[in-house]
A protein has these predicted regions:
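N-terminal targeting signals for export/organelle localization
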Residues: 1-37, 166, 195
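Residue-level recognition of beta-strand->loop/alpha-helix junctions
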Residues: 92-94, 132, 168
Length: 195
């Protein structure tokens, strides 16, 4: 028999996928942004929804410099996990009169929801994952995260069963959030203990 050896060298197989990756990025950039208004009752319903998806909730505003600074990382996370049942749900604390400003910011960030994400949203009776919250900060905290103290940005990673896996006020550490998401989704895709 011939011994089995490890292949060594540089893998270039991904080079041939560059045109496909460019198409995917172009589709993301062209995805329309829809912003809906959401009150406390709607947020409570969204938060309590039974789903098979991990959700990253982000409370933010266009007038909040740390929120603006971290947003590209949130978009990156959303794209990274688009095919893995992970949703980015944004909750803007801007005034309702600034809805167009919110939509313009999200469009500039290329934060449109993918077809896969829109399909999941439509299954729950929503048209988007981007919301302008119309209630008070206290109502938002009561509906989303009773431990939220008030400052933004405020980010949660929530398991499909509703358990909060990650809670952070301030600018997120992208790799930390990615690690939390991977720990959760790998429970379903990884090898079973003892095997």
């Amino acid at each position: 028999p011939v011994p089995i050896t490890r292949p060594m060298g540089c893998s270039t197989k991904w080079r041939e996928k560059q045109p496909m990756a460019a198409q995917v990025h172009a589709a993301w950039a062209a995805a329309p942004v829809v912003v809906e208004r959401l009150d406390a009752a709607g947020l409570a319903k969204l938060r309590a929804a039974k789903t098979d998806r991990v959700r990253v909730y982000n409370v933010w505003a266009t007038w909040c410099p740390p929120c603006v600074k971290e947003f590209p990382d949130l978009v990156s996370i959303s794209r990274q996990f688009d095919m893995r049942n992970v949703d980015l749900i944004t909750l803007s604390m801007d005034k309702p009169a600034d809805e167009a400003k919110v939509a313009a910011f999200l469009t500039k960030q290329q934060a449109g929801v993918s077809r896969r994400g829109l399909s999941a949203a439509k299954n729950e009776g929503r048209a988007t994952n981007h919301f302008l919250f119309t209630g008070s900060p206290d109502e938002l905290a009561a509906a989303l995260d009773p431990e939220m103290l008030g400052p933004i940005p405020h980010t949660l990673v929530v398991a499909p069963n509703g358990k909060i896996l990650y809670r952070h006020t301030g600018i997120i550490n992208r790799l930390q959030v990615v690690g939390v998401i991977l720990d959760e989704i790998n429970r379903f895709y990884g090898p079973k203990p003892g095997k």
